[in-house]
């Protein structure tokens, strides 16, 4: 993990300010730091060295010095793109994916984004055009925040780096607070800070004297194909998984793997052929502690398992630190376990694989079985709606919520796996009035893109974009 910061607009002591901003994200890159300050632009980078350890330092400059890059992430297919660029006449001075990214942008422009395979967040400053170009990977694995503060445009890997800039104004965005109560996080591009936004996944931006433009460069597609037989799908999934895991292991340092008792992380650990796996658990209850299973599985695949039981004291003692690193409220408790497992892994290596994101693709959430699980779904929707409205007005009683939910279309009732407070509940709890959009207004654009798909696919598509 690396991190970067930057801002436009000439300001006194820009080199001191950018250094303070870099120091705020030192935890993202303990191996090295670099900065570039020139009139209208200041860039800073903190590096965790993974590929071309000696020559991949940043900020990284183009051959003629006209462009400067700060980059967080990995381009897994950088070697094949590099070969294409060499055939096009490009000459390289390093073996890093950083240089491939910058030269690729010079050669292909925005087309490069769809050529790349990886996780990335980056910003390029064009000295001649006085223009910033930034982009974020397909699923938003790597972060990119930006803020408009008067004449100053700030950007970086974490919001906390903005706080030390003298022109940053720290104000609570109450709209994000209301959305958080339903989604467990801020589901739109807005953040908890006024005038601070996050670049959506699969988007790029251009910032110059003409203004700010943000556009999507990629869309995920769920193209169902019922023709192949089960064995065909087994073989296809196996091929894709092996290819993906092998691509993710592109590194000049050792790679490990997280391991729980789940199918996803177990599958990844088994085919990755790494030397070390990492697991954490809470207490001794098997519902919250999967260390025993992880050790047994690691032994079966002949790998070293590193584990830790998190005590209540460690849990509460680190909670504020965990929240600090997330910048914004996030009500997903799995973030705490991830913090601890990352902590034990970081003591032995720099790169780990995980099974995160597999439930959305493989339909792993229990709620995905709901559309096909009851005979009641065969009752006409008009009848279910009437029953649902009657039940909604009745005093709370076990079982009534089933009829309320089934009296609504999927688009009305399912707003993602993170659903917490209803719009009416959050309005009654909050003491402030906001113009926050309703949950269904936020999810509507995603449902529109898969309006002809089956309900399970719709749910997967929504979660893939919103959870």
Write out the residue ranges for each language-model feature.
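Short, intrinsically disordered, charge-balanced linker/junction segments flanking boundaries
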Residues: 271, 458-467
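Short, polar/flexible loop-turn hinges at active-site or ligand-entry regions and domain interfaces
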Residues: 85-93, 110-112, 163-171, 190, ...
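ATP-dependent adenylate-handling active sites, centered on carboxylate activation for C-N bond formation
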Residues: 4, 8-19, 87, 128-153, ...
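N-terminal glutamine amidotransferase
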Residues: 1-74, 103-221, 242-246, 269-271, ...
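Short amphipathic alpha-helical segments and their helix-coil junctions
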Residues: 84-89, 441-455
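Short, conserved phosphate-binding/catalytic loop or strand-edge motifs used
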Residues: 98-102
């Amino acid at each position: 993990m690396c991190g970067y910061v930057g801002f436009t607009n000439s300001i006194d002591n820009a080199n001191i300010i950018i250094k303070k901003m870099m120091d705020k994200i030192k935890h993202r890159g303990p191996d090295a730091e670099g900065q570039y300050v020139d009139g209208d632009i200041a860039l800073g980078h903190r590096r965790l060295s993974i590929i071309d350890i000696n020559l991949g330092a940043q900020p990284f400059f183009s051959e003629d010095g006209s462009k400067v890059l700060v980059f967080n992430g990995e381009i897994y297919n950088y070697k094949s793109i590099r070969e294409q660029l060499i055939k096009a006449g490009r000459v390289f001075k390093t073996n890093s994916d950083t240089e491939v990214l910058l030269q690729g942008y010079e050669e292909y422009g925005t087309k490069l984004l769809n050529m790349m395979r990886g996780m990335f967040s980056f910003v390029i400053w064009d000295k001649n055009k006085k223009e910033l170009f930034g982009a974020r990977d397909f699923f938003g694995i790597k972060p990119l925040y930006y803020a408009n503060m008067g004449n100053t445009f700030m950007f970086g890997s974490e919001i906390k780096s903005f706080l030390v800039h003298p022109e940053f104004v720290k104000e609570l965005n109450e709209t994000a607070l209301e959305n958080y109560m339903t989604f467990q996080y801020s589901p739109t591009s807005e953040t908890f800070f006024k005038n601070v936004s996050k670049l959506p996944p699969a988007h790029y931006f251009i910032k110059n004297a003409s203004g700010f433009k943000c556009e999507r460069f990629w869309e995920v597609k769920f193209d169902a194909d019922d023709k192949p037989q089960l064995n065909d799908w087994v073989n296809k999934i196996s091929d894709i998984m092996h290819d993906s895991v092998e691509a993710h292991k592109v590194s000049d340092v050792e790679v490990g793997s997280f391991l729980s008792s789940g199918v996803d992380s177990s599958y990844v650990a088994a085919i990755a052929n790494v030397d070390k796996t990492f697991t954490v658990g809470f207490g001794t209850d098997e519902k919250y502690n999967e260390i025993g299973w992880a050790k047994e599985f690691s032994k079966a695949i002949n790998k070293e398992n590193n584990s830790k039981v998190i005590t209540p004291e460690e849990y509460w003692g680190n909670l504020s630190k965990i929240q600090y690193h997330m910048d914004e409220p996030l009500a997903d408790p799995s973030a705490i376990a991830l913090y601890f497992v990352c902590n034990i892994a970081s003591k032995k290596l720099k790169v780990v694989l995980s099974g995160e994101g597999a439930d959305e693709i493989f339909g792993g959430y229990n709620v995905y079985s709901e559309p096909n699980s009851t005979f009641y779904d065969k009752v006409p929707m008009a009848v279910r709606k009437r029953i649902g409205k009657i039940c909604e007005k009745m005093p709370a009683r076990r079982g009534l919520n089933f009829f309320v939910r089934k009296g609504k279309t999927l688009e009305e009732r399912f707003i993602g796996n993170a659903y917490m407070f209803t719009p009416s509940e959050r309005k009654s709890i909050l003491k402030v009035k906001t113009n926050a959009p309703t949950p269904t207004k936020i999810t509507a654009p995603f449902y529109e893109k898969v309006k002809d798909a089956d309900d399970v696919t719709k749910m997967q598509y929504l979660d893939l974009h919103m959870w």
